[in-house]
Amino acid sequence: MSLHPISDKAEVSVDFPDKAYIGSFGRHSQFDAYADDDSVAVRLVRPGEDRREAVMHLHYGLLADILVELARSLASRPQLDEQHRNDLNKAAKQLWRSLEPRSAG
């Protein structure tokens, strides 16, 4: 697992009845994403004095449900700009290829 630069930005919020935690991760932050037998994980790291780290684990069934909802949401709104569309399309194709059956050899 290695950290990669964040090329855009992310915001994370966790709401509890008596408090909320909010963190932003921008171009000076890093991320890691990995898969194991049961789930995927996304880790966001903001280094420095105000260091923050957020990790989310999603089991494959939930990840599939989230991807379906994201597809529905994107289809129901005005088309994304060309750069974001191309970036997402390239990533989706790479995900698709990684899920193709592999020979046992």
Spell out what each predicted region is.
Residues M1-G105:
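Positively charged, low-complexity terminal tracts
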